[in-house]
Regions:
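Eukaryotic N-terminal low-complexity, Ser/Thr- and Lys/Arg-rich leader segments
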Residues: 26, 254-270
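Conserved PLP-binding catalytic core of the aspartate aminotransferase-like
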Residues: 153, 157-208, 217-224, 231-233, ...
Length: 270
């Protein structure tokens, strides 16, 4: 929606970002305006982290503001759960911090933390905000309470990391490909058609009581499937063991061709 000139750098590639910053710096020198670098704190599909320490280090060479979408990092990353910026020790160098109430806060809605003048500008000029409804009071009160819990009950976050590490290490030990995640987001990469992927997800939900989301082409290459698991602090190590076993079972069935490669699930039979 922005009319601004856009430069795209290769995912998490700092040399690519540097080149784009050089181009952007030359551009704004002739047109005026400023530079805004945008990244995720935790990338929602693969679970890897944006290199916020390396990005903010470039501020010593280039004049730009940094916007971090930390939907998956807020509440889980950093010593106090303040997010990926805190994890890297550069939270004070993030100019616009975006978070959501829909992940760690188990609600809905979102927020932007920034300087007051920028916040006021967004409030009155951002298209998605102009005619939006306010959050309901129960949601606001619930978010405040959950924020208090995040701050006063660090054991919940510690339990979450225990569960996440157990799940990820267990999946890898059983030969599962979970990519390069180093966050709570736990992707499991499999090979198969979209139809097979739909049946795997259906099988997990109906026969193993495991709900997970599926990501298919064009988000990932054709012939690949990404099943995304999100552990919580309410899960137990027994849940983890059960999940690992279930994924091993469906992966074996997929490899044997037991899921139909072409026919989609007949919704009338669900």
């Amino acid at each position: 929606l922005s009319p601004a000139k856009r430069y795209v750098y290769v995912h998490n590639d700092m040399s690519s970002l540097r080149k784009q910053l050089e181009h952007a710096t030359k551009y704004v020198a002739t047109t005026g305006g400023g530079i805004l670098v945008v990244t995720e704190g935790v990338f929602g599909m693969a679970g890897d982290l944006g290199k916020l320490d390396e990005i903010t280090a470039l501020k010593s060479e280039f004049n730009f503001r940094l916007l971090v979408d930390d939907a998956h990092g807020f509440g889980t990353m950093g010593p106090t759960g303040a997010g990926t910026g805190e994890h890297f020790g550069v939270q004070d160098k993030v100019d616009l911090y975006f978070g959501t109430f829909a992940k760690a806060m188990a609600g809905f809605g979102a927020f932007v933390a920034t300087d007051e003048d920028v916040c006021m500008s967004l409030r009155y000029t951002m298209r998605s905000q102009m005619f939006a409804k306010s959050l309901t009071m129960p949601m606001v009160e619930g978010a405040i309470k959950r924020l208090e819990m995040l701050k006063s009950q660090p054991e919940r976050r510690e339990k979450l990391w225990t569960i996440a590490h157990a799940l990820q290490n267990g999946l890898k030990a059983d030969g599962m490909n979970i990519g390069i995640t180093n966050s709570m987001v736990t992707p499991v990469y499999l090979s198969g058609s979209v139809a097979e992927g739909m049946q795997v997800v259906f099988d997990l939900r109906e026969n193993y009581n495991i709900f997970c989301s599926i990501v298919v082409y064009p988000v990932i290459p054709k012939g690949q499937l990404l099943l995304r698991l999100i552990p919580t602090s309410m899960h137990t190590l027994e849940d983890v063991k059960y999940t690992i076993k279930a994924f091993k079972n469906v992966a074996e069935k997929l490899a044997k061709g037991e899921y139909n490669k072409e026919l989609l699930i007949d919704a009338s039979k669900l």
